[in-house]
Amino acid sequence: MKIGILAIQGSIVEHKNMLERLGVETVLVKKPEHLEIIDGIILPGGESTTFFTILENRLLFDALREKLVNGLPAMGTCAGLILLSSRIENHPDQKTLKVLDITVSRNAYGRQRESFSTYVKIPVIGDREYECIFIRAPQIVEIGRNVKVHATFNDRPIFVEENNILGLTFHPELTDDPRIHEYFLKRCSG
């Protein structure tokens, strides 16, 4: 199995290290042709407007969207989630991939200094609580009817799934706990 990591910005190395720790080969996705050799893709955190600009410049936006619409499993964390979303409440003109039927609000928990971590129950990955690290995180403010909510914090979804797409408002790659990545890998292997 080969998992791609959208290698534009953000926590690329951290996701790569986690996947390699799990024995998974990784591909740093920088060009459309990289999408042809992967079994799933991670869209890491970063700055969502920058992601879009670079995706467009590298002709990756449409190619990635087509792959996702056709079933390529994806996991978006933080800004990656924003990129996957259908709507951005506080930036309605920002273009997104529109493959996850959610509305998000960018930087909803505040600025960098308001970043925090907390432990939550996520039943789909086991009984033990999971440390969720929020860094200038988005909030999911609305979900479509086919979106499953796997975890919440303060009554807001923080981990959702729709078809082949996982979306997280937090950064699982910044923990030592591989369970979120393991869950994603199960989705990639069918």
UniProtKB/Swiss-Prot annotation:
Keywords: Glutamine amidotransferase, Hydrolase, Lyase, Pyridoxal phosphate. One of its GO terms (biological process) is glutamine catabolic process. The active site is at 78 (nucleophile), 171 (charge relay system), 173 (charge relay system). It holds the Pfam family SNO. Pathway: Cofactor biosynthesis; pyridoxal 5'-phosphate biosynthesis. InterPro entries: Class_I_gatase-like, PdxT/SNO, PdxT/SNO_CS. Its EC number is 4.3.3.6, 3.5.1.2. L-glutamine binds at residues 46-48, 106, 135-136. It comes from the Bacteria. It catalyses: aldehydo-D-ribose 5-phosphate + D-glyceraldehyde 3-phosphate + L-glutamine = pyridoxal 5'-phosphate + L-glutamate + phosphate + 3 H2O + H(+); L-glutamine + H2O = L-glutamate + NH4(+). SUPFAM superfamilies: Class I glutamine amidotransferase-like (SSF52317). One of its GO terms (cellular component) is glutaminase complex. One of its GO terms (molecular function) is pyridoxal 5'-phosphate synthase (glutamine hydrolysing) activity. HAMAP family: PdxT. Belongs to the glutaminase PdxT/SNO family. In the presence of PdxS, forms a dodecamer of heterodimers. Only shows activity in the heterodimer. NCBIfam families: PLP_synth_Pdx2. Catalyzes the hydrolysis of glutamine to glutamate and ammonia as part of the biosynthesis of pyridoxal 5'-phosphate. The resulting ammonia molecule is channeled to the active site of PdxS. This is Pyridoxal 5'-phosphate synthase subunit PdxT.
